[in-house]
Amino acid sequence: MALASSPAQRVIWQDIINFVERHPSNGSHCMKIRKLSLIAIAFLLLPSWVRASLDVELQGLEGEAQQNVATYLAAIAPEERDGSYRFKARVERDVRQALQAVGYYQPKITLNAPEGDTLVVSVNPGPPVNVAQVDVVFSGEAAMDDDFHSLKAKGPQPGHRLNHSDYESLKSQIQSLAVKKGYFDGRFTQARLEVAPDRQQAFIRLHFASGKRYHFGAIDYQGSQIQHKRLDTLRDFSPGDLYQVTDLGEFNQALANTGWFASALVQADMEDAEDNEVPIKVTLTPEARNKFETGVGYSTDIGPRLKLNWRKPWYNSRGHSLSTSLAVSQPEQTLTSTYKVPLDDVSREYYQVQLGLKNTDQRDTTSFEATTSVSRHWLYDTGWQRSVSLRWLYENYSQGQDEDIVSVVLPGVNVTRTRVRGGLMPHWGDKQSLTLEAADPAWLSDISLLRLQGRSAWIRSLNKNHRGLLRVDGGALISEEFREAPPSLRFFAGGDNSIRGYGYETVSPVDDSGQLSGARYMLTGTLEYQYRLGGNWWWAVFADGGDAWTNHLSWKRAAGTGIRWSSPVGPIRLDVAHGFDNDDDDFRVHLTLGPEL
């Protein structure tokens, strides 16, 4: 027996030896036995932290076999890796079981004497066991269900090397599919994996008797403050339809998305199922009648901003809702109230009435706006949203040398789609938006105009550490009465979400007095690359460009670098940018909070 070699072990063994030397046996046979017993007991009582812990080195394996064996051996606790016979037997047993799991039933395993702190295990896996027969049979109504036969086609096939996990996976998938599709009485009449190692053959036998498929029964709403007929439009199934668990999940999500409920739970009531029909229980908890939110924000465009929101998620039993928001900063103050009226298809179609007030005092713009709009919205399964609107705008303004009071009625149409994957800091996403509005004295407007504005933005990633952003914004105001058009309909560029390196809405034509006048046209673009520094922190480098012009396009260029933090409330962006078009251009700092699309 080799003595332990660690410093702690040597100290303990030296204490034992000293004790024995101080108590000589004087030749007594009994005393010799006592000494040997003492040594053995002391070794057994040694704490685990002083015993040697051996590493295991595998030789002769590769691929899936090597990975599976390594996984088995990694489960052996360090205190058990003591080089004992029991440890070696455990290693051999685990290697054999791990190889059997991936189809090797006749391995040759050699455990070499430990070299230092390493036990070398040499393995010849031997010939693999291949699947000779796959006997998968479905009876009952599942026999005519293509989804079950698709599972069989994707499972183990004759000629493939046996893998126990493939067999278990197929068995589990059949059971899971049966539950998802309502074969609640289904069971295996045969479920065996037979292996003949000497012949290197395996036989898979799975016979599943599904019985009859269940149908949806009655829908029982509990705790709802909203009319049941409104909730019915949120589900894509009816009593009597074939049961499908995904229908319940989609219904649950649709209920949650309405904002009417603090919690929603849709589940099959199996205890009351009869005659192959399962009732559906919908348990709902109403959302609070009034919700208040306050917040403080900051951006370099408008400085500090105070926000207050008041929402009534459900105003009445028909599911109408009301929201009012107030935002106050030094250059801008806005008050907006929105009333939403869901239609028969409550999750996809609704009317919206909006009232708004806005006061602006920013550089060469002084404006007071009052707006009223009515809009009709459609949401499609493709992700696109469409709306038509009628908006009345009253604006008392001073823009450079232009001063006026204007009233315009703007019928319009908008199409938009936003797609994201990956939460608040998406690794993939895009946004497309296009808005067209028109005004004419024929429908009580002071001026005639056509206004078009659009955005296209894209986020794409290469693995987890590289991220790119491309964004293009454009607009046009077509009118022979441009100088009568209010500032809110003209175009400006520059700022945190436009051309960084330039001040907020400072890119614009100027009038004879040198003051900003706003533009007929606007086109800006951003190209940005981001690299993950670690965790939720990113480094960014970007180039921005564009212009807002009336007669002559003068492309503005800027570039810079910055830091991104994916915070719990959304991306926070800190950038330093520099313009390249004027001798007096300087570095500008931009700080923003919010989504990039």
Predicted regions and their residues:
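N-terminal amphipathic/basic-hydrophobic helices that include classical n-h-c signal peptides
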Residues: 1-30
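Periplasmic polypeptide-binding modules associated with outer-membrane biogenesis and secretion
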Residues: 52-64, 71-300, 309, 323-341, ...
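Bacterial N-terminal signal peptides that target proteins for export
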Residues: 30-38
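Short glycine-rich, acidic/polar surface loops and turns
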Residues: 525-528, 556-564
